[in-house]
Amino acid sequence: MGSNSSPPAVLQLCYENVNGSCVKTPYSPGPRVLLYAVFGFGAVLAVFGNLLVMISILHFKQLHSPTNFLIASLACADFWVGVSVMPFSMVRSIESCWYFGRSFCTFHTCCDVAFCYSSLFHLSFISIDRYIAVTDPLVYPTKFTVSVSGICISISWILPLAYSGAVFYTGVYADGLEEVSDAVNCVGGCQVVVNQNWVLIDFLSFLIPTLVMIILYGNIFLVARQQAKKIETVGNKAESSSESYKARVARRERKAAKTLGITVVAFMISWLPYSIDSLVDAFMGFITPAYIYEICVWCAYYNSAMNPLIYALFYPWFKKAIKVIMSGQVFKNSSATMNLFSEQI
């Protein structure tokens, strides 16, 4: 009498014939191709979109401003996420294996954390910049100079790189979790297990700047509403050239603040699920299913691809700069001094 039971599934390993290899749990062909397309598109957009932002701001002299230099540096951080983090995380997420070695796993994790915090620092300084620009637009050029912007950029790179290097190359993040760490660190894996103390520090490092940005942008839009009422009042009277100039400057700064406010909101929405998930896992015993964790991770990664899309939607100068770059006009000697703004202020 024949048996109806199916043969047992063959256990797949990341490295066949290697002791201590991680178990491989690959997707079926259809979802696998779809995931490579979705994740790959995000990586390509993060690389080339942010490269366009950097080229635009650094090439066109009209865009050389303290705020735009901060935006270019933010784009640089997102660019490196697309180059050094997303492609390798894509393979790990889809193949459920890490094929790039233990040393590169540590380097990859450092880059992941450093560029995330670099983005957060940049957005915090941009929020301060916009707050000063909107609340005191005429004094702003003397307060937030290119030199000040350079200091902010330096801080936004040096502190995150030093922090991530110190934490992940010393191994302090796993103190007290040696047994758990040994259990998940099989050959072909790149899972970082972080103890409660460091997860709490990371969460507060995300939460505190986020709350500061929310407060700053809340004040920005309150001031913007007051300015709009004043401009409407002035518009109903015979306005002097000085009042007209103030109104145009205020209008420009409000528009810039709105666009960058959207960028901040996008960052918060992208990173909040991952931050909460990390906190829950650390204090609840790593209970999050793998697929939920991957969704949270890739929501965070996709933030690096979103900023160029936001700029393209809300910044006419960026659209024009893209056309000039893609058409090859950027190689003309006169392109650096080209006017990218349709209206004068």
From Swiss-Prot:
Pfam families in UniProt: 7tm_1 (PF00001)
Sugar attachment sites: 19
Membrane topology qualifier: Multi-pass membrane protein
Extracellular side: 1-32, 90-107, 169-202, 277-282
Stored InterPro entries: GPCR_Rhodpsn, GPCR_Rhodpsn_7TM, TAAR, TAAR_fam
Gene Ontology molecular functions: trace-amine receptor activity
TM helices/strands, residue ranges: 33-53, 69-89, 108-128, 148-168, 203-223, 260-276, 283-302
Protein localization: Cell membrane
GO terms under biological process: adenylate cyclase-activating G protein-coupled receptor signaling pathway; G protein-coupled receptor signaling pathway
Domain notes: In addition to the well known disulfide bond common to G-protein coupled receptor 1 family, trace amine-associated receptors (TAARs) contain an unique disulfide bond (Cys-22-Cys-186) connecting the N-terminus to the extracellular Loop 2 (ECL2), which is required for agonist-induced receptor activation.
Protein's UniProt name: Trace amine-associated receptor 6
Gene from which this protein is expressed: Taar6
